A protein has these predicted regions:
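Conserved ATP/PPi-binding loop(s) of AMP-dependent carboxylate-activating enzymes
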Residues: 378-409, 447, 541-542
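Conserved pre-ATP/AMP-binding loop-to-beta segment of ANL
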Residues: 50-52, 178-199, 205-206, 229-235
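Conserved AMP-binding/adenylate-forming core of the ANL superfamily
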Residues: 50, 54-108, 125-130, 214-215
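Conserved AMP-binding A3 loop
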Residues: 64-69, 188, 195-219
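Gly/Ser/Thr-rich phosphate-binding loop
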Residues: 257, 284-289, 298-357, 369, ...
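Conserved AMP-binding/adenylation subdomain of ANL enzymes
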Residues: 218-238, 242-286, 300
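AMP-binding/adenylate-forming catalytic core of the ANL superfamily
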Residues: 124, 131, 141-144, 287, ...
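ANL superfamily adenylate-forming
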Residues: 60-61, 146-191
Length: 558
């Protein structure tokens, strides 16, 4: 029953993939009491299914291609072996693996067992891992064999398993592939049981623990499938590192919900040319990448690459209009934007076949009632992006684990509060303004950092930009831009003047960036700019002298 209900909802969205109005109006999420996505959907769909489910290509030319049927059987073997290692329903497993087949085996196996998976990036340092082990109440650790030293100073009552090599004191996951390919669950799984525990990237505070259920991500990501425009047989490439929610979004649930192939290209060092060549060589049909990657790709001559893609998507941070324009000019395909969080699936997006308004993230996705709420708690044309809890979306998290106060803070007054602000127009298109704590006032005018950053990266020398308030005796605060430059450009007084001139011709006087500084931008390990760090640095600097690469608009005559 759960399989047919899930597939019926999926098929409805795929049948209306270019008919947004019908999809949004008539979509009914499946109502499930018991549901285990890996057993009740994936295994049923995978039985006798020889279509490719996973295709991993390495930069040395080697590759692995696994069918749906193979992934079902391999994950059964891993589930049986993990059960033998003591993994029980509800146990928390920290998984820190690269883009390798055992990662997908382990994720499927954990779901089948009813365990709670805590994905972690391989970039984590021992102190970060200690935090995850302690706050995440981890009972089992599964990691790549090259990372075991990070755990030497992390004692604890957890089982230890490696992938890829033998290490003293650790079990090897490779032993699992001697187990039976048949798996029997120990009982039913409730749709409300916990499934995933994610640590957020911490752009503004200490990482929070986001707890998702057996339906919130698996079923909720039907909205993500719809936004991406995925169809059966697609070769879908999502450029994202394991350990982050976006990897689970688009390298696990969304493509497999659609019956598509997950494509992975493993490289030691990012180069735009290698990405574009792989895109062509492997006939990728749908590509999703963060704005940072898109900004690097457009520095190549995209017209030299005869891609076969149908859908292009940006995710992770808002897309700047300049990037969308350049991709459209080169390939004739509209790069589509969207919005979601670790706490949810895709909430807002420009869906396939719909008119795209430059600068807008699109419209609410099927299954989401999105409202903009102002400072007085009223629904408005500009305000915080909120979800109406009267029709609570399936894709919303259960809670912040072990933090009822924080959960109550974001789920108050009948809304889930995202902490992001936006504006909505008469057609229902939503335009991102910024994090609620990023928007600031200068001379009593509200300033959106994202708007100014979008203009800044239109300058030929600017690769990335972050705008924060800088204290000013007269205006209280003025916009200051921190800039990294494209290859071939060096910071200088002359370049600073040229950027100020460029901005004066494109921004109203009250919006102008009055100060700028060249240098590297602080980022989280997931690649998001830590504006909170830049903002705090400005607040704390006091009367400290300017840096050698810092310039004020007032230094120049125009």
């Amino acid at each position: 029953m759960s399989y047919s209900a899930f597939v019926q909802a999926r098929d409805f969205l795929q049948a209306h993939r270019t008919d947004y109005e019908t999809a949004y109006r008539d979509y009914q999420p499946p109502q499930l009491t018991e549901f285990n996505w890996a057993l009740d959907y994936f295994d049923v769909m995978a039985k006798g299914n020889d279509r490719p489910a996973l295709w991993v290509v390495n930069e040395d030319g080697s590759e692995q291609k696994m069918s749906y049927s193979q992934m079902s059987q391999r994950s059964n073997q891993v589930a049986n072996w993990l059960r033998g290692q003591g993994v029980k329903r509800g146990d928390r497993i920290l998984m820190m693996l690269g883009n390798e087949v055992p990662l997908w085996d382990t994720m499927l196996a954990a779901i089948k067992l009813g365990a709670v998976l805590t994905p972690a990036t391989t970039l984590l340092a021992p102190d970060d891992l200690r935090d995850r082990l302690d706050r995440g109440q981890v009972r089992h650790v599964i990691i790549g064999h090259t990372h075991t030293e990070k755990f030497t100073s992390l004692p604890g009552d957890y089982t230890r398993t490696t992938v890829g090599g033998a290490v003293a004191g650790w079990q090897q996951l490779e032993q699992a592939y001697q187990e039976s390919t048949e798996f029997a669950p120990d009982g039913p799984t409730l749709a409300t049981d916990p499934q995933l525990l994610y640590f957020t990237s911490g752009t503004t505070s200490k990482p929070k623990l986001v707890l998702h259920s057996q339906q919130s991500y698996p079923v909720g990501h039907l909205s993500t499938m719809y936004w991406l425009g995925l169809q059966p047989g697609d070769v879908h490439w999502n450029i994202s590192s394991p350990g982050w929610a976006k990897h689970t979004w688009s390298c696990f649930f969304a493509p497999w919900n659609a019956g598509a192939t997950i494509f992975i290209f493993n490289y030691s060092r990012f180069t735009a040319a290698a990405i574009l060549e792989t895109l062509v060589r492997c006939s990728v049909t749908t590509l999703c990448a963060p704005p940072t990657v898109w900004r690097m790709l457009i520095q190549e001559d995209l017209r030299k690459y005869p891609v076969k893609v149908r859908e292009l998507i940006g995710a992770g941070e808002p897309l700047n209009p300049e990037v969308i324009d350049q991709v459209k000019e080169a390939w004739g395909i509209t790069l589509r934007d969207g919005f979601g969080q670790t706490e949810t699936t895709a909430q807002v997006g420009n869906s396939p076949g719909q008119p795209v308004k430059l600068g807008s993230m699109g419209r609410p996705m099927p299954g989401y009632q999105v409202r903009l709420v102002d400072m007085d708690g009223r629904v408005a044309e500009e305000g915080e992006i909120c979800l109406d809890l009267a029709s609570r979306p399936i894709g919303l998290m259960i809670s912040y684990a072990d933090d009822p106060e924080k959960t109550a803070e974001v789920m108050r007054d009948g809304f889930y509060h995202t902490g992001d602000t936006a504006a909505i127009d008469a057609d229902g298109y939503i335009t991102y303004v910024g994090r609620a704590d990023d928007v600031f006032k200068a001379s009593d005018y509200r300033i959106s950092p994202f708007e100014l950053e979008s203009v800044l990266i239109e300058h030929e020398a600017v690769a990335e930009a972050a705008v924060v308030p800088s204290p000013d005796a007269l205006r209280l605060a003025v916009p200051k831009a921190f800039l990294t430059l494209r290859a071939g450009y060096e910071p200088s007084r002359e370049l600073a003047r040229d950027i100020f001139v460029f901005l004066r011709s494109r921004l109203s006087p009250y919006k102008r960036v009055r100060r700028l500084e060249f240098g590297e931008l602080p980022k989280t390990i997931s690649g998001k700019i830590r504006r909170v760090e830049l903002r705090k640095g400005e607040q704390d600097r006091g009367a400290a002298p300017r840096g050698a690469l810092e310039f004020y608009e007032e230094d120049f005559e125009f």
